[in-house]
Amino acid sequence: MSLQSYDKDIYDLVNLELKRQCDHLEMIASENFTYPEVMEVMGSILTNKYAEGYPGKRYYGGCEFVDEIEQIAIDRCKELFGCEFANVQPNSGSQANQGVYGALLNPGDKILGMDLSHGGHLTHGAKVSSSGKMYESFFYGVELDGRINYDRVMDIAKIVKPKMIVCGASAYTREIEFKKFREIADAVGAILFADVAHIAGLVVAGEHQNPFPHCDVVSSTTHKTLRGPRGGIIMTNNEEYAKKINSSIFPGIQGGPLVHVIAAKAVGFKHNLSPEWKIYAKQVKANAKKLGKVLISRGFDLVSGGTDNHLILMSFLNRDFSGKDADIALGNAGITVNKNTVPGETRSPFITSGIRVGSPALTARGMKEAEFELIANKIADVLSDINNASLQEKIKGELKELAHKFIIYDKATF
Protein backbone atom coordinates (compact mmCIF):
# COMPACT_ATOMS: atom_id res chain seq x y z
CA MET A 1 0.00 0.00 0.00
CA SER A 2 1.31 3.48 -0.84
CA LEU A 3 1.84 6.28 1.67
CA GLN A 4 -0.76 8.32 -0.20
CA SER A 5 -3.47 5.71 0.26
CA TYR A 6 -2.51 4.65 3.80
CA ASP A 7 -1.82 8.01 5.49
CA LYS A 8 -3.05 10.91 3.43
CA ASP A 9 -2.44 13.40 6.25
CA ILE A 10 1.31 12.78 6.25
CA TYR A 11 1.43 12.34 2.47
CA ASP A 12 -0.18 15.73 1.91
CA LEU A 13 2.14 17.49 4.36
CA VAL A 14 5.25 15.91 2.82
CA ASN A 15 4.13 17.10 -0.59
CA LEU A 16 3.42 20.58 0.72
CA GLU A 17 6.98 20.60 1.99
CA LEU A 18 8.15 19.51 -1.47
CA LYS A 19 6.28 22.48 -2.94
CA ARG A 20 7.87 24.81 -0.39
CA GLN A 21 11.35 23.53 -1.19
CA CYS A 22 10.72 23.90 -4.93
CA ASP A 23 9.04 27.34 -4.78
CA HIS A 24 11.27 29.06 -2.21
CA LEU A 25 14.97 29.91 -2.26
CA GLU A 26 16.62 27.96 0.56
CA MET A 27 19.48 30.08 1.91
CA ILE A 28 19.86 28.77 5.46
CA ALA A 29 23.60 28.03 5.56
CA SER A 30 23.22 24.71 7.40
CA GLU A 31 20.67 23.28 4.95
CA ASN A 32 21.22 21.56 1.63
CA PHE A 33 19.54 19.27 -0.88
CA THR A 34 20.76 15.69 -0.68
CA TYR A 35 20.88 13.23 -3.55
CA PRO A 36 17.94 10.98 -4.58
CA GLU A 37 20.14 7.89 -4.20
CA VAL A 38 20.97 8.93 -0.62
CA MET A 39 17.25 9.14 0.17
CA GLU A 40 16.61 5.88 -1.67
CA VAL A 41 18.93 3.86 0.55
CA MET A 42 17.63 5.64 3.68
CA GLY A 43 14.19 4.31 2.82
CA SER A 44 15.47 0.76 2.30
CA ILE A 45 15.07 -2.49 4.25
CA LEU A 46 18.30 -1.67 6.09
CA THR A 47 16.14 0.19 8.61
CA ASN A 48 15.01 -3.23 9.89
CA LYS A 49 18.47 -4.39 11.03
CA TYR A 50 19.94 -4.05 14.52
CA ALA A 51 23.74 -4.02 14.56
CA GLU A 52 25.05 -3.09 18.01
CA GLY A 53 28.83 -2.96 17.96
CA TYR A 54 31.23 -2.42 15.09
CA PRO A 55 32.14 -4.34 11.90
CA GLY A 56 33.35 -7.81 12.86
CA LYS A 57 32.39 -7.29 16.53
CA ARG A 58 28.59 -7.26 16.72
CA TYR A 59 26.24 -8.29 19.50
CA TYR A 60 23.64 -9.49 16.98
CA GLY A 61 23.76 -12.13 14.28
CA GLY A 62 22.98 -11.58 10.63
CA CYS A 63 25.30 -8.59 10.28
CA GLU A 64 27.52 -9.91 7.49
CA PHE A 65 26.16 -7.46 4.92
CA VAL A 66 25.79 -4.45 7.18
CA ASP A 67 29.39 -5.04 8.29
CA GLU A 68 30.48 -4.55 4.69
CA ILE A 69 28.28 -1.46 4.33
CA GLU A 70 29.70 0.19 7.44
CA GLN A 71 33.27 -0.66 6.45
CA ILE A 72 32.75 0.98 3.05
CA ALA A 73 31.46 4.11 4.81
CA ILE A 74 34.47 4.11 7.16
CA ASP A 75 36.98 3.64 4.34
CA ARG A 76 35.44 6.38 2.21
CA CYS A 77 35.35 8.76 5.16
CA LYS A 78 39.03 8.14 5.89
CA GLU A 79 39.91 8.71 2.24
CA LEU A 80 37.93 11.96 2.17
CA PHE A 81 39.62 13.55 5.18
CA GLY A 82 43.01 11.86 4.89
CA CYS A 83 42.87 10.28 8.35
CA GLU A 84 43.59 6.88 9.92
CA PHE A 85 40.42 6.23 11.92
CA ALA A 86 36.75 7.11 11.47
CA ASN A 87 33.52 6.42 13.36
CA VAL A 88 30.44 6.76 11.14
CA GLN A 89 27.82 5.81 13.76
CA PRO A 90 26.90 9.15 15.44
CA ASN A 91 23.28 10.02 14.76
CA SER A 92 24.02 13.75 14.65
CA GLY A 93 26.79 16.30 14.91
CA SER A 94 25.80 17.04 18.50
CA GLN A 95 26.08 13.35 19.41
CA ALA A 96 29.43 13.17 17.64
CA ASN A 97 30.67 16.03 19.81
CA GLN A 98 29.20 14.43 22.92
CA GLY A 99 31.06 11.24 21.99
CA VAL A 100 34.36 13.09 21.70
CA TYR A 101 33.93 14.76 25.08
CA GLY A 102 32.94 11.49 26.72
CA ALA A 103 36.00 9.77 25.29
CA LEU A 104 38.66 12.33 26.14
CA LEU A 105 37.37 14.38 29.09
CA ASN A 106 36.23 13.82 32.65
CA PRO A 107 33.32 15.73 34.18
CA GLY A 108 34.53 19.12 35.37
CA ASP A 109 37.45 19.34 32.93
CA LYS A 110 38.00 22.73 31.32
CA ILE A 111 37.14 23.29 27.66
CA LEU A 112 37.75 26.43 25.61
CA GLY A 113 35.41 26.98 22.68
CA MET A 114 34.01 29.73 20.52
CA ASP A 115 31.29 31.85 22.13
CA LEU A 116 27.85 30.97 20.76
CA SER A 117 26.99 34.64 20.27
CA HIS A 118 30.18 35.10 18.24
CA GLY A 119 29.50 32.22 15.85
CA GLY A 120 30.23 29.10 17.89
CA HIS A 121 27.83 26.23 18.55
CA LEU A 122 25.71 25.08 21.48
CA THR A 123 27.86 21.96 21.86
CA HIS A 124 31.07 23.96 22.24
CA GLY A 125 30.40 24.66 25.90
CA ALA A 126 27.25 26.80 25.94
CA LYS A 127 25.77 26.76 29.44
CA VAL A 128 22.38 25.52 28.21
CA SER A 129 24.06 22.50 26.57
CA SER A 130 25.28 19.34 28.28
CA SER A 131 28.77 20.40 27.14
CA GLY A 132 28.45 23.46 29.38
CA LYS A 133 26.92 21.55 32.27
CA MET A 134 29.26 18.55 32.46
CA TYR A 135 32.45 20.52 31.79
CA GLU A 136 33.81 23.87 32.94
CA SER A 137 33.53 25.92 29.77
CA PHE A 138 35.36 29.07 28.77
CA PHE A 139 35.13 31.06 25.56
CA TYR A 140 37.00 33.03 22.95
CA GLY A 141 35.26 35.13 20.33
CA VAL A 142 35.82 37.43 17.41
CA GLU A 143 36.93 41.05 17.39
CA LEU A 144 34.62 43.82 16.24
CA ASP A 145 35.91 43.21 12.70
CA GLY A 146 34.35 39.75 12.86
CA ARG A 147 37.64 37.84 12.80
CA ILE A 148 39.32 35.57 15.33
CA ASN A 149 42.35 37.20 16.96
CA TYR A 150 44.62 34.20 17.50
CA ASP A 151 46.95 36.13 19.81
CA ARG A 152 43.95 36.88 22.01
CA VAL A 153 42.93 33.19 21.96
CA MET A 154 46.48 32.32 23.06
CA ASP A 155 46.21 34.77 25.96
CA ILE A 156 42.89 33.27 27.07
CA ALA A 157 44.22 29.72 26.77
CA LYS A 158 47.23 30.53 28.93
CA ILE A 159 44.94 31.90 31.64
CA VAL A 160 42.33 29.10 31.47
CA LYS A 161 44.69 26.16 30.78
CA PRO A 162 41.93 24.01 29.26
CA LYS A 163 42.08 20.24 28.85
CA MET A 164 40.57 20.70 25.37
CA ILE A 165 40.34 23.52 22.84
CA VAL A 166 37.42 23.40 20.41
CA CYS A 167 37.81 25.12 17.06
CA GLY A 168 35.03 25.36 14.52
CA ALA A 169 31.89 27.44 14.20
CA SER A 170 28.33 27.63 12.98
CA ALA A 171 28.49 31.26 11.85
CA TYR A 172 32.08 32.30 11.06
CA THR A 173 32.74 33.70 7.61
CA ARG A 174 36.52 33.43 7.43
CA GLU A 175 38.91 30.51 7.03
CA ILE A 176 39.78 28.78 10.29
CA GLU A 177 43.54 28.57 10.74
CA PHE A 178 44.02 25.15 12.30
CA LYS A 179 47.82 25.49 12.40
CA LYS A 180 47.51 28.54 14.68
CA PHE A 181 45.09 26.65 16.93
CA ARG A 182 47.66 23.81 17.07
CA GLU A 183 50.29 26.25 18.30
CA ILE A 184 47.90 27.50 20.98
CA ALA A 185 46.99 23.95 22.06
CA ASP A 186 50.65 22.94 22.24
CA ALA A 187 51.47 26.00 24.35
CA VAL A 188 49.03 24.90 27.06
CA GLY A 189 49.13 21.12 26.60
CA ALA A 190 45.52 20.89 25.39
CA ILE A 191 43.79 18.40 23.14
CA LEU A 192 42.76 20.15 19.90
CA PHE A 193 39.29 19.22 18.67
CA ALA A 194 37.88 20.62 15.42
CA ASP A 195 34.18 20.64 14.63
CA VAL A 196 34.04 21.16 10.85
CA ALA A 197 30.32 20.47 10.43
CA HIS A 198 29.76 23.65 8.43
CA ILE A 199 32.85 23.59 6.23
CA ALA A 200 33.44 19.85 5.71
CA GLY A 201 32.26 19.91 2.10
CA LEU A 202 34.78 22.63 1.33
CA VAL A 203 37.55 20.88 3.27
CA VAL A 204 37.30 17.61 1.34
CA ALA A 205 37.33 19.53 -1.96
CA GLY A 206 40.46 21.47 -1.04
CA GLU A 207 38.52 24.75 -0.79
CA HIS A 208 39.33 25.15 2.92
CA GLN A 209 42.43 23.97 4.78
CA ASN A 210 42.18 20.48 6.27
CA PRO A 211 42.11 20.17 10.08
CA PHE A 212 44.50 17.21 9.69
CA PRO A 213 47.33 16.90 10.62
CA HIS A 214 46.94 19.82 13.04
CA CYS A 215 43.95 18.60 15.07
CA ASP A 216 43.85 15.58 17.37
CA VAL A 217 40.17 14.84 16.73
CA VAL A 218 37.72 16.09 14.09
CA SER A 219 33.93 15.84 14.01
CA SER A 220 31.41 16.78 11.36
CA THR A 221 27.87 16.37 10.23
CA THR A 222 27.27 14.58 6.94
CA HIS A 223 24.61 16.96 5.65
CA LYS A 224 25.24 20.74 5.37
CA THR A 225 28.04 21.31 2.84
CA LEU A 226 28.61 17.54 2.40
CA ARG A 227 25.07 17.09 0.97
CA GLY A 228 24.66 13.64 2.52
CA PRO A 229 22.07 12.32 4.99
CA ARG A 230 21.56 13.89 8.40
CA GLY A 231 24.13 12.38 10.73
CA GLY A 232 27.55 12.72 12.34
CA ILE A 233 31.10 11.38 12.00
CA ILE A 234 34.29 11.48 14.09
CA MET A 235 37.84 11.17 12.75
CA THR A 236 41.32 10.94 14.29
CA ASN A 237 44.87 9.75 13.57
CA ASN A 238 45.39 8.63 17.17
CA GLU A 239 44.67 4.93 17.69
CA GLU A 240 44.21 5.29 21.45
CA TYR A 241 41.73 8.12 20.93
CA ALA A 242 39.93 6.09 18.26
CA LYS A 243 39.35 3.20 20.67
CA LYS A 244 38.05 5.56 23.35
CA ILE A 245 35.79 7.32 20.85
CA ASN A 246 34.32 4.03 19.64
CA SER A 247 33.52 3.05 23.22
CA SER A 248 32.11 6.49 23.96
CA ILE A 249 29.67 6.24 21.04
CA PHE A 250 28.77 2.58 21.65
CA PRO A 251 27.93 1.62 24.32
CA GLY A 252 28.48 5.08 25.83
CA ILE A 253 25.69 7.18 24.35
CA GLN A 254 24.12 5.08 21.58
CA GLY A 255 22.83 1.56 21.13
CA GLY A 256 22.12 0.07 17.73
CA PRO A 257 23.38 2.31 14.91
CA LEU A 258 21.09 3.50 12.12
CA VAL A 259 22.33 1.15 9.42
CA HIS A 260 20.17 2.72 6.71
CA VAL A 261 21.71 6.12 7.48
CA ILE A 262 25.25 4.69 7.56
CA ALA A 263 24.61 3.28 4.08
CA ALA A 264 23.37 6.71 3.01
CA LYS A 265 26.55 8.27 4.43
CA ALA A 266 28.58 5.87 2.28
CA VAL A 267 26.64 6.91 -0.83
CA GLY A 268 27.13 10.57 0.05
CA PHE A 269 30.86 10.02 0.53
CA LYS A 270 31.05 8.50 -2.95
CA HIS A 271 29.67 11.76 -4.31
CA ASN A 272 32.19 13.73 -2.22
CA LEU A 273 35.03 11.67 -3.70
CA SER A 274 33.98 12.34 -7.30
CA PRO A 275 35.64 14.95 -9.58
CA GLU A 276 32.28 16.75 -9.79
CA TRP A 277 32.44 17.48 -6.08
CA LYS A 278 35.36 19.88 -6.46
CA ILE A 279 33.36 21.81 -9.07
CA TYR A 280 30.38 22.06 -6.72
CA ALA A 281 32.45 23.21 -3.72
CA LYS A 282 34.28 25.83 -5.77
CA GLN A 283 30.92 27.15 -7.00
CA VAL A 284 29.57 27.29 -3.43
CA LYS A 285 32.39 29.68 -2.50
CA ALA A 286 32.10 31.73 -5.69
CA ASN A 287 28.37 32.17 -5.17
CA ALA A 288 28.78 33.25 -1.54
CA LYS A 289 31.44 35.78 -2.55
CA LYS A 290 29.19 37.19 -5.28
CA LEU A 291 26.31 37.45 -2.82
CA GLY A 292 28.46 39.38 -0.35
CA LYS A 293 30.00 41.67 -2.95
CA VAL A 294 26.60 42.76 -4.29
CA LEU A 295 25.13 43.35 -0.83
CA ILE A 296 28.12 45.49 0.15
CA SER A 297 27.69 47.49 -3.07
CA ARG A 298 24.07 48.07 -2.05
CA GLY A 299 25.20 49.61 1.24
CA PHE A 300 24.76 46.71 3.66
CA ASP A 301 27.25 45.75 6.38
CA LEU A 302 28.73 42.25 6.38
CA VAL A 303 30.49 40.84 9.42
CA SER A 304 34.23 40.61 8.58
CA GLY A 305 33.54 42.47 5.33
CA GLY A 306 32.89 39.37 3.25
CA THR A 307 33.45 35.62 3.27
CA ASP A 308 36.00 32.86 2.67
CA ASN A 309 33.46 30.06 2.76
CA HIS A 310 29.80 29.26 2.10
CA LEU A 311 28.04 31.91 4.19
CA ILE A 312 27.75 35.58 4.92
CA LEU A 313 26.54 37.38 8.04
CA MET A 314 24.61 40.60 7.50
CA SER A 315 24.72 43.04 10.41
CA PHE A 316 21.88 45.46 11.15
CA LEU A 317 23.43 47.08 14.22
CA ASN A 318 23.21 50.42 12.43
CA ARG A 319 19.68 49.84 11.13
CA ASP A 320 16.31 50.40 12.75
CA PHE A 321 15.18 46.83 12.07
CA SER A 322 16.32 43.54 13.61
CA GLY A 323 17.48 40.19 12.34
CA LYS A 324 14.05 38.81 13.15
CA ASP A 325 12.42 41.55 11.07
CA ALA A 326 14.72 40.74 8.14
CA ASP A 327 14.09 37.01 8.51
CA ILE A 328 10.32 37.53 8.32
CA ALA A 329 10.44 40.03 5.45
CA LEU A 330 12.69 37.82 3.33
CA GLY A 331 10.52 34.81 4.13
CA ASN A 332 7.51 36.72 2.83
CA ALA A 333 9.52 37.36 -0.35
CA GLY A 334 10.29 33.66 -0.84
CA ILE A 335 13.82 33.63 0.60
CA THR A 336 14.48 31.41 3.63
CA VAL A 337 17.29 32.57 5.94
CA ASN A 338 17.79 32.62 9.71
CA LYS A 339 18.24 35.42 12.20
CA ASN A 340 21.65 35.40 13.86
CA THR A 341 23.59 37.26 16.53
CA VAL A 342 26.51 39.41 15.38
CA PRO A 343 29.65 40.81 17.07
CA GLY A 344 28.68 43.75 19.28
CA GLU A 345 25.15 42.38 19.58
CA THR A 346 22.66 44.65 21.36
CA ARG A 347 19.47 42.63 20.94
CA SER A 348 18.33 39.34 22.48
CA PRO A 349 19.12 35.98 20.81
CA PHE A 350 15.42 35.73 19.90
CA ILE A 351 15.53 39.05 18.05
CA THR A 352 19.20 39.52 16.99
CA SER A 353 20.84 42.17 14.85
CA GLY A 354 21.78 40.00 11.90
CA ILE A 355 20.95 37.20 9.51
CA ARG A 356 23.00 34.26 8.27
CA VAL A 357 22.76 33.58 4.54
CA GLY A 358 24.31 30.57 2.78
CA SER A 359 24.94 29.39 -0.76
CA PRO A 360 25.12 25.53 -0.60
CA ALA A 361 21.46 24.64 -1.28
CA LEU A 362 20.94 26.96 -4.23
CA THR A 363 24.29 25.89 -5.65
CA ALA A 364 23.05 22.30 -5.43
CA ARG A 365 20.10 23.38 -7.57
CA GLY A 366 22.53 24.57 -10.24
CA MET A 367 22.56 28.31 -9.61
CA LYS A 368 25.73 30.28 -10.33
CA GLU A 369 27.02 33.84 -9.97
CA ALA A 370 24.43 35.39 -12.29
CA GLU A 371 21.55 34.02 -10.22
CA PHE A 372 23.24 35.00 -6.96
CA GLU A 373 23.72 38.55 -8.21
CA LEU A 374 20.01 38.75 -8.99
CA ILE A 375 19.07 37.23 -5.62
CA ALA A 376 21.41 39.56 -3.73
CA ASN A 377 19.75 42.55 -5.34
CA LYS A 378 16.31 41.21 -4.42
CA ILE A 379 17.47 40.76 -0.82
CA ALA A 380 18.70 44.35 -0.84
CA ASP A 381 15.41 45.56 -2.35
CA VAL A 382 13.39 43.87 0.39
CA LEU A 383 15.59 45.10 3.23
CA SER A 384 15.75 48.64 1.86
CA ASP A 385 11.96 48.88 2.12
CA ILE A 386 11.36 46.28 4.81
CA ASN A 387 7.73 47.12 5.59
CA ASN A 388 6.58 47.07 1.95
CA ALA A 389 4.33 43.98 1.85
CA SER A 390 3.34 44.47 -1.80
CA LEU A 391 7.01 44.57 -2.83
CA GLN A 392 7.64 41.36 -0.90
CA GLU A 393 4.74 39.66 -2.68
CA LYS A 394 5.98 40.87 -6.08
CA ILE A 395 9.51 39.61 -5.45
CA LYS A 396 8.14 36.30 -4.15
CA GLY A 397 6.48 35.75 -7.52
CA GLU A 398 9.64 36.67 -9.43
CA LEU A 399 11.80 34.37 -7.34
CA LYS A 400 9.32 31.52 -7.68
CA GLU A 401 9.78 31.78 -11.45
CA LEU A 402 13.55 31.66 -10.95
CA ALA A 403 13.28 28.69 -8.59
CA HIS A 404 11.23 26.73 -11.11
CA LYS A 405 14.08 26.97 -13.61
CA PHE A 406 16.21 25.00 -11.16
CA ILE A 407 13.94 22.20 -9.92
CA ILE A 408 15.93 19.56 -8.07
CA TYR A 409 13.20 17.05 -7.11
CA ASP A 410 10.11 15.97 -9.05
CA LYS A 411 8.73 13.88 -6.18
CA ALA A 412 8.80 13.91 -2.40
CA THR A 413 9.80 10.33 -1.58
CA PHE A 414 12.39 7.97 -3.07
Swiss-Prot record:
GO molecular function, one term: pyridoxal phosphate binding
Record's keyword annotation contains Manganese: no
Keywords in alphabetical order: Amino-acid biosynthesis, Cytoplasm, One-carbon metabolism, Pyridoxal phosphate, Transferase
Compartment(s): Cytoplasm
Catalytic reaction(s) noted: (6R)-5,10-methylene-5,6,7,8-tetrahydrofolate + glycine + H2O = (6S)-5,6,7,8-tetrahydrofolate + L-serine
E.C. number(s) listed in UniProt: 2.1.2.1
Pathway given in the UniProt record: One-carbon metabolism; tetrahydrofolate interconversion; Amino-acid biosynthesis; glycine biosynthesis; glycine from L-serine: step 1/1
UniProt entry tagged with the keyword Amino-acid biosynthesis: yes
Transmembrane residue ranges: none
Primary role: Catalyzes the reversible interconversion of serine and glycine with tetrahydrofolate (THF) serving as the one-carbon carrier. This reaction serves as the major source of one-carbon groups required for the biosynthesis of purines, thymidylate, methionine, and other important biomolecules. Also exhibits THF-independent aldolase activity toward beta-hydroxyamino acids, producing glycine and aldehydes, via a retro-aldol mechanism.
HAMAP family: SHMT
Protein name as it appears in the record: Serine hydroxymethyltransferase
